[in-house]
UniProtKB/Swiss-Prot annotation:
GO terms for molecular function: DNA binding; DNA strand exchange activity. Disulfide bonds: none annotated. The active site is at S71 (o-(5'-phospho-dna)-serine intermediate). GO terms for biological process: DNA recombination. Pfam families: HTH_17 (PF12728), Resolvase (PF00239). CDD domains: HTH_MerR-trunc (cd04762), SR_IS607_transposase_like (cd03769). InterPro entries: DNA-bd_dom_put_sf, HTH_17, IS607_transposase-like, Recombinase/Transposase-rel, Resolv_N, Resolvase-like_N_sf, SinI_DNA-bd, Transpos_IS607. This is Uncharacterized protein MJ0014. Signal peptide: none annotated. It comes from Methanocaldococcus jannaschii (strain ATCC 43067 / DSM 2661 / JAL-1 / JCM 10045 / NBRC 100440) (Methanococcus jannaschii).
Length: 213
């Protein structure tokens, strides 16, 4: 069965290539990019042309990214463990990887390297993203993000697929949400922020200990 090549609108192509629509129109007139025309006379850019311009000739030339994240500076040891786990996994599979890491909440979508990763994925420069756990990429909406990556030909590889209990997930989400909004309200380095997050964690630990008695 013949597979039809995908054709992008100028707006879609401009986002992927990081140039303006007018630039694409100039390239078309100058013969720098080969566009096709619809029956209505609209320009469309074949995927092969986008790949040619991006320098992506085939799947093997796309990067494999290892992404690691922790919420706080005090968790740098955990960050390093994630990185070593990802590197070991990649080595076992014979993959060359690039590591991207962030220190910040999983609710914060403005993380520097998270934004960089999204841009790389949208530019179709990433074949795989390796993570230690699903919540390292995002605290909520992981399945949606997974489908988003898939639409750009990027696979998410999860090393540790062990599922947490609903209670464990709820506790982690509660701590993350409180930490996130307390940081917004008081500032990440303020005394009020540290006191509030410490209190919440202590309450959670006490309740957990009671249930195990």
């Amino acid at each position: 069965m013949m597979i039809m090549e995908r054709h992008y609108t100028l707006k879609e192509a401009s986002k992927i290539l990081g140039v303006s629509i007018k630039t694409l129109q100039r390239w078309d007139k100058a013969g720098k990019i080969k566009c096709i025309r619809t029956l209505g006379g609209k320009r469309r850019v074949p995927e092969s042309e986008i790949k040619r311009i991006l320098g992506i000739k085939d799947k093997e030339q796309r990067k494999i990214i290892g992404y690691a994240r922790v919420s706080f500076n005090a968790q740098k040891d955990d960050l390093e463990r994630q990185i070593q786990l990802i590197k070991s996994y990649a080595e076992e599979n014979g993959w060359d990887i690039q590591i991207l890491k962030d220190i910040g909440s999983g609710l914060n979508e403005k993380r520097k390297n998270y934004k960089k990763l999204l841009k790389m994925v949208m530019n179709r420069k990433v074949e795989k993203v390796i993570i230690a756990y699903p919540d390292r990429l995002t605290r909520f909406g992981f399945e949606t993000l997974k489908e988003f990556f898939k639409s750009y030909g990027t696979e998410i590889v999860i090393i540790n697929k062990k599922h947490k209990t609903p209670q464990e997930e709820l506790v982690e989400d509660l701590i993350t949400i409180v930490s996130h909004f307390a940081g917004k309200l008081y500032g990440m380095h303020s005394h009020k922020y540290k006191k509030l997050t410490k209190t919440v964690k202590e309450i959670v630990r006490e309740e957990d200990a009671k249930e195990k008695e």
